[in-house]
Amino acid sequence: MTDLHKEWEKVQEMAFASWVNSVLEKRGGVEKISDVSTDLSDGVKLIFFLESVSGKKFPKKFDLEPKTRILRIQNLHLAMLFVDEDLKVKVQGVAAEEFVDNNKKMILGFLWTLYRKYRISVINEGDKSSEEGLLAWVKKTTDGYSGVNITNFKASFRDGNAYLALAHKFDPSVFKYDEFSGKDQIERLNAAFDFAEKGLGIPKLLDAESLSKGNVDERSIILYTSLFFHAYRAKEEREALEASQNSLANKLASLEQSLEGEKTSQDELARQKKELEESLRLIRQQNEQRNQRIADIQSKIDDALRGIDDEKMAKLDLESRLSKTEKDKAILELKLAETLDENERLRNKIEEDKKRAAAEAEGLGLLRTHIGHQITDIAKWQSFLDNPEAVPYTKTPVNLEAELASLQFEEQAKRLGSKVENENISLEKYLSLKEEELKSAGAPKKRTK
């Protein structure tokens, strides 16, 4: 292992032990650790640390006093699952056995991953975060200090001016920054480390000579510098808390003064108490009355809801009946339409029958008149032939009209036709007879011998 790696490992051990202890101290009731490679091997303190640093409750039950290797591995396995599944932190190649076997390299790698997530990744300055955000924060914080030029972690911190400026900016009353301008790099670095340890509570993680020569791993510089950032943030939080406490104290003092100035006599307080008690009694009475009204209203609502349910059932029944009625109505309308069509057909037929009857009546009248004339003419001929000197007959015999009046149209027509035919036959016979008589009268009689 190279000296650089050894230095980096030493820095990590000190930094991570300090970080873990600061987290466990806030939790309370947990003994501090001194060696990260051995004091986390049973998984108990590691689980407490993970809960506190993440703010999440450990979801599984674990053994608080694991006596055997298997029980310690079980605890650590649950811790690894918690990191992976709940904290969403991916740690490659680190298993529970690494902690049980005190594999310092793997344990430090595991803690470095957690440190980057919870202590470096949370650093933001402007539009930059993590390492870039940390570098931007240092540049902003040390702005205006002579001899400070922040460009990167590898070269910008070797002369000690950056760390001196950070320590001075934190508390300018401790020392004067300019008094170290003539000192060499190692002196400035050692002074900065001393001021940081005493004023900011930052442990001496780096070796001044190694840092001045550029023999310190960049990750060690980032880790040490991040402690300044969190010291500043802790100071800001303390100042904000103190300001809040002072504000609260001022408000309490003002309130006490107001109360002192507004004290009233015991009689006034007693009177106010009595009034309040009476008001309270009235309020309780009103509450009881209101509760009773609410109960009555609720009862009415329940009745109304039951009525609504009944109405719904009645509505469904009515809708069912209406549906059947609509069907019946459609059938009746169809039958009505058919009936109306039939009535129309019958009216038309009646009209036609009326017209036909009128025509038949008119024809019958004409036929009766015509037949009557014929009968009259026949009667005239009969009368004339019987008595040529007699007045011509002009009236249809009465017995014929009476006979026809009692018959239907077809019977009248048939009777008249038969009558005319009979009259014609009678007339022909009569004429034949007369003709024979005339012939007989005109022929010479035979002489008798």
UniProtKB/Swiss-Prot annotation:
Q: Which GO terms describe its cellular component?
A: cytoplasm; cytoskeleton
Chain ranges of the Calponin-homology (CH) domain: 10-119, 128-233
Q: Which of UniProt's keywords are assigned here?
A: Actin-binding, Coiled coil, Cytoplasm, Cytoskeleton, Repeat
Q: Please give the chief subcellular localization of this protein.
A: cytoplasm
Q: How does it assemble?
A: Homodimer; parallel.
Role description: Actin-bundling protein. When linked to F-actin the actin filaments form preferentially anti-parallel bundles that associate into meshworks. Plays a major role in cytokinesis.
Write down what this protein is called.
Cortexillin-2
